[in-house]
Amino acid sequence: MTLNSLPAWTALQSHFEQIRHARLRDWFAPQNDPAPTRAERFTFSGGGLAADFSKNRITDETLRLLVQLAREARVEARRDAMFAGEIVNPTEGRAALHTALRATDPHAPFHAQVSAERAKMATFARAVRNGTWTGHTGKRIRHVINIGIGGSDLGPKMVTHALRHVATRDISMHFVSNVDGADLARVLEQVDPEETLAIVVSKTFTTLETMTNARSLRDWFVAKGCPEDALAKHFVGVSANPAEVVKFGIAADNVFEMWDWVGGRYSLWSAVGLSIMIAIGPEQFDELLAGANDMDRHFREAPLERNLPVLLGLIGIWYRNFFGSQSYLVAPYSEALHYLPSYLQQLEMESNGKSARLDGRFVDYPTAAVTWGEPGTNGQHAFFQMLHQGPTIVPIDFIAVLTPEHPLASHHPKLLANCFAQSEALMLGRTLEEARKVAGPGKEDLAPHLTFPGNRPTTTLLVDALTPRSLGALIALYEHKVLVQATVWDINPFDQWGVELGKILGKVVEADLAADALDTAKHDSSTTALIARARAALKR
């Protein structure tokens, strides 16, 4: 049965027509919001987090029908299959067991293997942190460069930045991902080769960007006086292909394993997170895993009606497939979560930006929305104008951390006030009549410019304090949200074939840039002209 033919889908279409013009400010009016209030009915907790869904354009009936949709789409069955280690990535014939990386149950899939690798990580991380592991001249490691791209970069960078307040001050963490040499050159200007450790992270250890940067970094070490037989003191590798790591020149003892049953964008819990563990220490890394495991248990055990990942995913479907929203915004009111929107861009769009269903037929409904965002309050002074007064409705996830992780506590009430006020303003709006009063006598022409449509939907996620545990829960919340949506849309969130074609053609273009003569028949006229211009520039 296709999605459009599910009874709940049909019922949701009728329900949408009934409430599409209803206004949130009316629903929140005191006479329409008796106890239990909307805030009480639509605020739920799990995994140490709280989520206020009340400012969404939903009613009790909306949630009832959305949960019915989840059941008809067999969300619970696919969830259970994923946790059990069944093949839930059929195009690659793989399980998706990122949850096993943080499981405490000794009967969980691959528990012994995961525990052994984490113990190896912890031993190494402690040695780097306490100075037992040194560079080839005996100096302590003061700089760690993580070389990876996509899931091998975004997750570790996001978490390391978010948890700087619990990280060691003795080691600086650097992240290099782009094949643009400026990325690596910028970092090399800041580090001493005698005090630098490189972590090269690639599932296959053949990724173009990562291996280009790794080779350049290896050459830099040698040029700076590191003997080739001493490079083992400065390089470790993380990969599912240990043989390729050794072929690159990294000592076998310096190889940390990841597995093909963990997707890159779900892998920060594995040895891919070695840079995180060095930064915050093994004990705090365990807390990160524990927080994710808290959310895993909530996802598995909470009824769908009160299940945070399920509700977050279903409400996203409500806006994407019924309201027709093209994008959604993530606005963490926390500078520590600066890189969370970038991380979620990959998690959501690489996972669910698909058009082929599991049975190979193409969807006839929208899937992943464009994910974007910026920390508050910066975003207010950049794009919130469009959110408030533009014609496009963009659903928003606000994320508020209730207690600061820094000593400037007097700033925090201002930060929280802005977060909560934005959600209220987006919901309420300002009518033309109200705008005329604001404009004042004789300025009626200004009133239209002072109106706000309102009725803009938002969810507010509350985190008591930004700790490794709460961050782990927050990340896992979005991981499971992705699975919920993928299940309803009947797509595979664990592959990423969309990145392949460009990589294949990229190798052809790279060869053409270096060829003695350009074959003008090989490409379309636009690409040929671009290559010709680049060839001329590269020869200058």
Swiss-Prot record:
Give the matching Pfam families. PGI
Q: Which GO terms describe its molecular function?
A: carbohydrate derivative binding; glucose-6-phosphate isomerase activity; monosaccharide binding
Gene Ontology terms: biological process: gluconeogenesis; glucose 6-phosphate metabolic process; glycolytic process
Q: Which InterPro entries match?
A: G6P_Isomerase (IPR001672), G6P_Isomerase_C (IPR023096), Phosphoglucose_isomerase_CS (IPR018189), SIS_dom_sf (IPR046348), SIS_PGI_1 (IPR035476), SIS_PGI_2 (IPR035482)
Q: Which pathway does the database say it acts in? A: Carbohydrate biosynthesis; gluconeogenesis; Carbohydrate degradation; glycolysis; D-glyceraldehyde 3-phosphate and glycerone phosphate from D-glucose: step 2/4
Q: Where in the cell is it found?
A: Cytoplasm
The catalysed reaction is: alpha-D-glucose 6-phosphate = beta-D-fructose 6-phosphate
> Keyword set for this entry?
Cytoplasm, Gluconeogenesis, Glycolysis, Isomerase
Q: Which PROSITE patterns match?
A: P_GLUCOSE_ISOMERASE_1, P_GLUCOSE_ISOMERASE_2, P_GLUCOSE_ISOMERASE_3
Q: Does the keyword ATP-binding apply?
A: no
Is Nucleus one of the keywords? no
Describe its function: Catalyzes the reversible isomerization of glucose-6-phosphate to fructose-6-phosphate.
Q: What is this protein called?
A: Glucose-6-phosphate isomerase
Q: What is the lineage of its organism?
A: Bacteria, Pseudomonadati, Pseudomonadota, Betaproteobacteria, Burkholderiales
Q: Which gene encodes it?
A: pgi
